[in-house]
Design a protein with these regions (language model features):
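Short, flexible beta-strand-to-coil junctions
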Residues: 47, 99-106, 113-117, 125-130
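A surface-exposed partner-binding patch
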Residues: 1-105
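Compact, glycine/acidic-enriched structural inserts
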Residues: 121-156
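A short pocket-lining beta-strand/turn micro-motif at the edge of beta-sheets
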Residues: 94, 118-121
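C-terminal end-of-chain micro-motif
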Residues: 1, 157-158
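Phosphate-binding glycine-rich loops and adjacent basic patches that engage nucleotide phosphates
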Residues: 2-7, 110-118
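Intrinsically disordered, low-complexity regions of eukaryotic proteins
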Residues: 63-66, 70, 109, 121, ...
Length: 158
């Protein structure tokens, strides 16, 4: 399944905001084009995801922790990527911050952006993952869903 099909099935439940032209310009000014593939920008322009709260049960979360996540605004994405850890290190590895944990940890959620994948996995990168050299051991990153489309198919929307 692809992301757009998955989003079309839940479109009526999405109560967030779509990406504005001003926010689009803000994103492309501050983040690398590699982190902002066309499919991702189009998704944010077409679907009101910004500010939506998504939940996923522990059973459906591949990390077995469960998800209670808010989809970040473009301003929050840029802040997480450029001003806060683990985002500062994660973007160097190709991870784009897209969500924040609402359960209490505040751990950010990311998509692994690569040129050849238009349905990346959704991962959680805990704040305490950085080693003493401020590096991330990618084997410690918590995979939540093997694809974003699968996450949209499996989640509940608050």
């Amino acid at each position: 399944m692809n992301i757009r099909f998955a989003l079309d099935t839940i479109r009526g439940q999405l109560s967030g905001l779509k990406l504005s032209n001003e926010e689009y310009n803000f994103l492309i000014t501050h983040l690398s084009p590699i982190l902002l593939p066309d499919w991702f920008i189009k998704m944010l322009l077409d679907y009101p995801l910004i500010g939506v709260n998504f939940t996923l049960s522990e059973i459906l979360d591949e990390s077995d922790l469960g998800v209670d996540m808010e989809w970040l605004s473009p301003k929050q994405m840029v802040e997480e990527a450029l001003e806060f850890y683990p985002g500062i290190v994660a973007i160097q590895l190709g991870y784009l911050p897209i969500g924040s944990c609402l359960i209490g940890s505040g751990d950010p959620y990311f998509l692994k952006m690569t040129l050849d994948n238009d349905d990346p996995s959704l991962v959680r990168i805990p704040h305490d993952i950085l080693d003493e050299n401020e590096k991330i051991d990618e084997s410690e990153i918590e995979q939540v869903c093997f694809s974003l489309s699968h996450f949209f198919e499996s989640c509940q929307i608050d």
